[in-house]
């Protein structure tokens, strides 16, 4: 069982604004599509459902963006140790670039889906936008409504079974990175 103080691990304003802007620029060059929900053992194919999730996504490539994979892997390792989760992590999915325009959101959900190579155990969100560029769009945990994350460059790592959401954006555009780290099923 998780202690409440270890529900997540955070680095506030860790990624410099110039790097956040470069990631946004690179992200906008990716193949951007409507975000899907689902995609687990019972539902092999994800589906677009704007009543649950309304955002656009693209995925970084391990060949052209290897530095990003390595950077995020390092933060995951530190969080896994510092928060004392010590989860068995064996792999990393491609980082997802996410765009939330006006009225876009992602309702409460868990990331802990199963895949052929294992299950998602740790999730990471990196806030790329300057908070003055958008209104709404707060990243929040279901059991931690007092914790609101909006600062540019903030990295949040948490167990993938923790429910969380992105509130609707009411003005502007919010950009973020999401990454998942996998391992064998919990025992």
Briefly describe each language-model feature range.
Residues 1-155, 161-187:
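Fe(II)/2-oxoglutarate oxygenase catalytic core
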């Amino acid at each position: 069982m998780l202690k409440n103080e270890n529900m997540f691990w955070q680095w506030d304003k860790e990624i410099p604004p110039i790097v956040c802007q470069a990631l946004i620029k690179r992200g906008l060059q990716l193949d951007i599509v409507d975000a899907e929900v689902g995609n687990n053992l019972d539902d092999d194919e994800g589906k677009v459902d704007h009543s649950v999730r309304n955002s656009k996504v693209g995925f970084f490539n391990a060949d052209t963006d290897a530095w990003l994979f390595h950077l995020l892997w390092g933060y995951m390792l530190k969080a896994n140790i510092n928060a004392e989760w010590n989860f068995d992590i064996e792999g990393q999915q491609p980082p997802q670039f996410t765009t939330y325009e006006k009225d876009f959101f992602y309702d409460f959900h868990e990331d802990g889906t199963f895949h052929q190579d294992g299950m998602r155990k740790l999730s990471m969100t990196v806030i790329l936008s300057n908070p003055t560029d958008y209104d709404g769009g707060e990243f929040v945990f279901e059991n931690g409504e007092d914790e609101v994350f909006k600062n540019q460059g903030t990295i949040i790592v948490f167990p993938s079974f923790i429910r969380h959401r992105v509130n609707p954006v009411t003005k502007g555009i919010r950009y973020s990175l999401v990454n998942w780290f996998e391992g064998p099923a919990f025992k």
